[in-house]
């Protein structure tokens, strides 16, 4: 597929390259959040469902009316963070054996909640402030792609230059040794899954901004 795509003369067209950058932003945000979980030797299987659920929360607010686009975005990110925090607490406080179990269950719960909050209907006509992140460009480059690059830079600095970033690596390397060295591994893990939820929410916002719709059934 890669060879045939590159061989196509239209592959290098400006519109196609910009389209690819816009489409990859969704997965890029999910991957940024997932990175933290993977470093701690865990995984978050609920990121896709979390993104859809956060988008559907925005859809429910848009359908109800009376909410600004900025408020929708803030609530969306708060909901994503809350879901991620619950994932972290299930792992650290209830001491479930592996995040595979808790996040897999959370994924199914979120799919159901996405259908409930939208009443299984597609929602459209979002404010321009919401669609700006997914559709607009700055000097020809998609806003969502620029935000992804900035997020990558910030994440690199955070993981390599801060004590919390190093604690995340230590937790993934040897959880018990890290705990015995005085690092609160429970808080570190909860932070990682909370950030995964925030990144999932950003992915949901970008998805709504690019398509202009949200659909709990998809």
Tell where the protein language model's regions lie, with residue ranges.
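Single transmembrane alpha-helix segments in multi-pass membrane proteins
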Residues: 2-9, 14-65, 90-95
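Inter-helical junctions in multi-pass inner-membrane proteins, predominant
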Residues: 7-19, 158-160, 165, 193-218
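Transmembrane helix-bundle core of multi-pass membrane transporters
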Residues: 99-162, 188-191, 207-218
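Hydrophobic alpha-helical transmembrane segments
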Residues: 20, 27-28, 49-53, 70-78, ...
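Hydrophobic positions within alpha-helical transmembrane segments of bacterial inner-membrane proteins
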Residues: 32, 36, 49, 73, ...
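Structural signal for alpha-helical transmembrane segments and their membrane-water exit/capping regions
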Residues: 1-12, 40, 115-119, 156-163
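Alpha-helical transmembrane segments within multi-pass membrane transporters and channels
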Residues: 66-107
């Amino acid at each position: 597929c890669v060879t045939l795509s590159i061989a196509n003369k239209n592959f290098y067209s400006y519109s196609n390259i910009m389209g690819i950058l816009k489409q990859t932003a969704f997965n890029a945000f999910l991957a940024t959040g997932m990175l933290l979980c993977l470093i701690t030797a865990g995984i978050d299987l609920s990121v896709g469902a979390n993104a859809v659920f956060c988008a559907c929360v925005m859809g429910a607010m848009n359908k109800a009316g009376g909410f600004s686009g900025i408020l929708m975005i803030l609530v969306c990110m708060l909901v994503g963070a809350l879901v991620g925090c619950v994932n972290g607490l299930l792992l650290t406080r209830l001491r479930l054996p592996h995040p595979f179990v808790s996040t897999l269950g959370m994924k199914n719960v979120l799919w159901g909640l996405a259908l409930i909050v939208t009443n299984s209907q597609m929602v459209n006509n979002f404010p321009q402030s919401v669609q700006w992140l997914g559709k607009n460009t700055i000097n020809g480059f998609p806003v969502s792609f620029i935000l992804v690059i900035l997020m990558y830079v910030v994440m690199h600095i955070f993981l390599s230059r801060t004590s919390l970033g190093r604690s995340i690596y230590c937790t993934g390397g040897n959880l018990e040794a890290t705990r015995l060295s005085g690092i609160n591994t429970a808080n570190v893990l909860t932070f990682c899954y909370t950030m995964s939820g925030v990144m999932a929410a950003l992915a949901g916002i970008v998805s709504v901004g690019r398509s202009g719709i949200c659909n709990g059934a998809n």
